[in-house]
Amino acid sequence: MKQKWINAFMDTATRFADLSSAVRLRVGAVVVKDNRIISIGYNGTPSGWDNTCEDKVYCDDGDWREQTDKLHDEWVTYKLTTKKEVIHAEANAISKLARSNESGLDGAMFITHAPCVDCAKLIYGAGINTVYYRNSYRDTSGIDFLTKCNIEVNKV
């Protein structure tokens, strides 16, 4: 695939990431086949649910300090944690693909962030054979899984 197309599809994934209601991390994904977008996704709660993707976990541990709130006239620290019901961008794109007349077989996925191992399994199951991502993730098990499955992985 030509670099100009890679850049265009990655920019598109970034634009869809901006649609996420998440505060901590916004992720976008685009599935492409024959230089044509066949599915998109971004991280968020299921359709019809409250769009709040994170919970505030209040803590006393200074190491957890992420943000502060005034609660009952006292400043308290909290950490935002992603709700378990949040669907990852890759999973959203693949589930939309499954509900369409398109197939991911031999397609490419463009993701703003490296996939987790669970999303990597979905990518493999969808028959996608190339993954492009922009930002690394602290856990490389998703990339390791894709590489082990002989899926071409490119950081752009």
PLM segments and residue spans:
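Zinc-dependent deaminase catalytic domain
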Residues: 1-156
